[in-house]
């Protein structure tokens, strides 16, 4: 199990990313626009740097919904490989069966 503080930190990062999403996209659009002036681009870069670090989506970590484990998380299920295997063996994931060839 992951520490509660680590789980809470990731939840905080998700909320911050949602809050600043529109503003980040607006600034990034100005920065990548070839028609905008150099001054506008520079101002946009400075404003983007002034946003909170945790507002960046790349700072988020995929974690297992049950345990909070940060590694080996399968996106399709939102669970770690260990919990997916346990759930699959109990038949709790519809359509998923053990491979056999």
Swiss-Prot record:
InterPro entries: Ribosomal_uS14 (IPR001209), Ribosomal_uS14_bac/plastid (IPR023036), Ribosomal_uS14_CS (IPR018271). SUPFAM superfamilies: Glucocorticoid receptor-like (DNA-binding domain). One of its GO terms (cellular component) is cytoplasm. One of its GO terms (biological process) is translation. Pfam families: Ribosomal_S14. Keywords: Ribonucleoprotein, Ribosomal protein, RNA-binding, rRNA-binding. GO terms for molecular function: rRNA binding; structural constituent of ribosome. Belongs to the universal ribosomal protein uS14 family. Part of the 30S ribosomal subunit. Contacts proteins S3 and S10. Binds 16S rRNA, required for the assembly of 30S particles and may also be responsible for determining the conformation of the 16S rRNA at the A site. This is Small ribosomal subunit protein uS14.
């Amino acid at each position: 199990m992951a520490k509660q503080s680590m789980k809470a930190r990731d939840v905080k990062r998700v909320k911050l990313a949602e809050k600043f999403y529109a503003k980040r996209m607006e600034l990034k659009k100005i920065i990548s626009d070839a028609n905008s002036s150099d001054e506008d681009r520079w101002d946009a870069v400075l404003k983007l740097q002034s946003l909170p670090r945790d507002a960046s989506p790349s700072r988020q970590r995929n974690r297992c919904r049950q345990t909070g484990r940060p590694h080996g998380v399968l996106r399709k299920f939102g669970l770690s490989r260990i919990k997916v295997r346990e759930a699959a063996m109990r038949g709790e994931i519809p359509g998923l069966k053990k491979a056999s060839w």
